[in-house]
Amino acid sequence: GSEMCIRDRYGDNGIVAFCFYIATLFRDIITDSTRSFPILNIYGKKGTGKTEFALFLMALFQNNPEVSNLESTTYYAMGEKCAEVSNMLVHFDEYKNSLSNKHIDFLKGVYDNAGRSKRSSDGEHREATKINCGVLITGQEMPTADIALFSRVIFLESQKSERSKEETDKYQKFLKLRNMCPTNITVGLMRYRENFNAGWYD
């Protein structure tokens, strides 16, 4: 299955990421009681496969997913992107500690389900857009610009390693599965929504 494939490729990191994916599917149920939900951060230097890792997780939700570069994505666009979906992953690439305070504050707010602040339709007051998606960030820098942000992420480090013939074969199998756009896995898991809801509150 897909969980075996991702475990073969990424080991314990793959297991953690797959658990995050499942939690994202039922994020609304989880946050009804926890009021918070962490960000998944895949960190790694260039060539370590972090983007391939992230794209596999995104492929579980949609074909040819859009990846937003944080440096060229405004604070407002981040909010709109997160508000568009529910119980689904949103991917922001190229995290850097030099990002603006607004970008960093937005990411911190994701943990508490708070999006960007905007003026209400009547113009009388400001309101925060609610976030109900899982957020995945990737980059070559650890998110240490603000310790409060670092405490809100599940931190996974993607490391480059020399591949044996067997590992290369597993990698090709991994890419093949990703390119098939395995959204059927997500559809299959949604059948267990009622079971998850009941079990979560047991």
Regions found by a protein language model. Name each.
Residues I6-D12:
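A short glycine/serine-rich beta->alpha loop
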